[in-house]
Amino acid sequence: MGAKPGSMKPSTVARGLGSVSRRTRARLVHVLKERGIRSLDVLAAVGSVPRHRFVDEALASRAYEDIPLPIGYQQTISQPFIVALMSEKLIAGSAGRKTVLEVGTGCGYQTAILAHLYEWVCSIERIQLLFERSENTLATLEVHNVELRYGDGYEGWEGGSNFDSILLTAAPEQIPPTILAQLAPGGCLVAPVGKAADQRLRIVSNKGGRFYEEEGEAVRFVPLVPGISE
């Protein structure tokens, strides 16, 4: 699904579109409403974040279609409906919305959505070139309530704990205990879990130190891979 490693560079990320982008974002919000997204905060975030700035210039005209798109390095930017659905489940299940941990920054689009929903976003990316690209894009868009790290998402956020929410944007076969341990009481974790042909969303709640798990929709994500890639 993704392009070959290194085939997409930060300099090719789309800019411009202006008022066209605003109109197409509004249409995308309407599509998400029709598909069942109800959170006004999530819909407002989708309506505010310019998705075309997170994809290659050649794909900018398709940025507001409800489809995933390649971002290089065998990775994709998720379908807007899935981004909205996971974000909606995340905030609905979380007692607080101060801090959120995202495992898998990718191009930074989901990160930007979370920045509209939480006071502070911590995000880890294992692919160095994607980390650099997302850092540059978010800085250009003046998204300042985020901290990005290049590292192994399997290990969670070094020195961090008690996140109100945790979101995984790649699928492990089982949720790593190191990540689950960083979820605060009253917090919610949302992740795609399973092998490629059999993945479903998992919604995990921390209720007084005990974890309760709920199964959600069938999804398809790239696998969560341990380690880092230069």
Name these PLM-found stretches:
Residues 2-101, 109, 113, 117, ...:
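Class I SAM-dependent transferase core
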Residues 89-212:
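Conserved nucleotide-cofactor-binding alpha/beta core module
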